[in-house]
Amino acid sequence: MGKIIGIDLGTTNSCVAIMDGTQARVLENAEGDRTTPSIIAYTQDGETLVGQPAKRQAVTNPQNTLFAIKRLIGRRFQDEEVQRDVSIMPYKIIGADNGDAWLDVKGQKMAPPQISAEVLKKMKKTAEDYLGEPVTEAVITVPAYFNDAQRQATKDAGRIAGLEVKRIINEPTAAALAYGLDKEVGNRTIAVYDLGGGTFDISIIEIDEVDGEKTFEVLATNGDTHLGGEDFDTRLINYLVDEFKKDQGIDLRNDPLAMQRLKEAAEKAKIELSSAQQTDVNLPYITADATGPKHMNIKVTRAKLESLVEDLVNRSIEPLKVALQDAGLSVSDINDVILVGGQTRMPMVQKKVAEFFGKEPRKDVNPDEAVAIGAAVQGGVLTGDVKDVLLLDVTPLSLGIETMGGVMTPLITKNTTIPTKHSQVFSTAEDNQSAVTIHVLQGERKRASDNKSLGQFNLDGINPAPRGMPQIEVTFDIDADGILHVSAKDKNSGKEQKITIKASSGLNEEEIQKMVRDAEANAESDRKFEELVQTRNQGDHLLHSTRKQVEEAGDKLPADDKTAIESALNALETALKGEDKAAIEAKMQELAQVSQKLMEIAQQQHAQQQAGSADASANNAKDDDVVDAEFEEVKDKK
């Protein structure tokens, strides 16, 4: 069995880790970094860039440089959070035919899982380069508060990237695994506060150790899937834009190029203000008007940034209270607080968390790498490489069906340990009703329409009977990935219907297969391009070395041979400008054939040079045989 890699597919950055023996190891990508920006760019010449190369060219290509795609994955276009992003993102978010949020890239409609798959492919390649063997299986992490549609969409992204997703696990749970695995922690209750680039989670986790076996049991989880570092950046960007407008009278919001530069500068300033009290946002030539170029130079203090984002930090406190309440614990029951996600480096976040829990958070967990390490550990558990670890996760939201009067009736309540299965018997609302519609919902609201609709299906063929008589058994079954399977059975007729919830939207099997094929075709064209470049380099080298040999041969090369070689060189030079690998190889072969006489001359010259240098060495050696004699002056005795 091959390695199961662990991938933290983040909103801002992604990370990949593997189990190396009993230790988890975070892998460096091709650029030498341990984390990869979750940025994908589609260039004008058809190239797809991922990570740092995509980030570097964002300023000149803002409309086709996609970031924070995780905020859109598994979401509907009409969702309030998506509509907020539509107005602030430089790229184009559109509604797909099925109502999902998709993207328009250079006139082509693309689904978020298809774009996230590019990041996963880079993670896969990073692991393959390190291991020297193909990787086909992965554990991928998601925010604990992701709903069913978002989890399913993440699995789809894995499939498009050529990975069999063996398990989807929650990010805070993964961080707890990373924290608890190599420590003699004994029995402890920990709080994992995970504030990443686009999502926020809090999980209360109990680690029990009995006879060397550790059980990680999630007691409760809560969060906000649209709160993260990107929102902090946006607050600072808006402040800078407003200040510039006050000063210069120009609104930069209409200039995508300026906004992209501003985004980079705001992110940099935010990071600097975690260690410094103030920083300068200095952007020369940010824009221009009739009077000439304009420059931005605005001082930002840590206090100013904190005042801009205070409500965002406070928004993360309410879920902490709910999670503790759901776990049946008080603040004093928490032994350790672990911070995960880059945004937790902000001093104000650390201070608020410390105030809430009444203790300083742990500093020995790397907030950028802990989640990927935990995913790799879970991969090790699945392959059997990691023993004595049991992970008990929970479903973050209640699951149920719509019943008479538009009410949500839960079958599985939130924070139920998964995998789990629950059945309940329902009946008809009308006399002689021959079919029922099972409308599956996820959420905590009493009114069905206020919850997330995950899908619906019909059970027909019910025998005619007075209302309330037929017995329809509805079964909810959640697997270890937190994905829901629903069945409904008429106990009288024995008729049954089953579905795996893929949300009322989501990608269908045909779309996923097409995207998998496209990804494979791209991989093939990438391989061909790489081979073409290698052949070009070989041809280029042959061209230069042959020209040099012709020069050195001088008059010793017969005129006929020289003409034939010149002609072959020109033919190769022309072929190198084209895209045909076979043509380049053929011209290289032709040049090699007509250059035989030249090769002989070159070899003779080389032999003569060697003989000459051997003679010179021999002469030097003779000179070396002369010994400097020592002598002393003898004075005559008088």
UniProtKB/Swiss-Prot annotation:
Residue ranges annotated as coiled coil are none
| Activity regulation description | UMPylation of the chaperone by YdiU negatively regulates its activity, facilitating Salmonella survival under ATP-limited conditions.
This entry's comment on induction and repression of expression is: By stress conditions e.g. heat shock.
Q: Which CDD domains match?
A: ASKHA_NBD_HSP70_DnaK-like
Keyword flag Nucleotide-binding: yes
Q: Which Gene Ontology molecular function entries are recorded, alphabetically?
A: ATP binding; ATP hydrolysis activity; ATP-dependent protein folding chaperone; heat shock protein binding; protein folding chaperone; unfolded protein binding
Q: How is it modified after translation?
A: Autophosphorylated; GrpE inhibits the autophosphorylation.
Family membership, please give it: Belongs to the heat shock protein 70 family.
Low complexity composition-biased segments: 603-620
Q: Which UniProt keywords apply?
A: ATP-binding, Chaperone, DNA replication, Nucleotide-binding, Phosphoprotein, Stress response
The protein's job, in short, is:
Acts as a chaperone.
Which residues, renumbered to this chain, carry the PTM Phosphothreonine? T199
Instruction: Name one cellular component (GO) term.
Output: cytosol
Q: Where is the signal peptide?
A: none
Per its UniProt record, what SUPFAM superfamilies does this chain match? Actin-like ATPase domain, Heat shock protein 70kD (HSP70), C-terminal subdomain, Heat shock protein 70kD (HSP70), peptide-binding domain
Put simply, this protein is called Chaperone protein DnaK
PANTHER family noted in UniProt: HEAT SHOCK PROTEIN 70KDA (PTHR19375)
Swiss-Prot/TrEMBL GO biological process terms: chaperone cofactor-dependent protein refolding; DNA replication; protein refolding
Q: What segment(s) does the record annotate as region Disordered?
A: 603-638
InterPro entries for this protein: ATPase_NBD, Chaperone_DnaK, Heat_shock_70_CS, HSP70_C_sf, HSP70_peptide-bd_sf, Hsp_70_fam
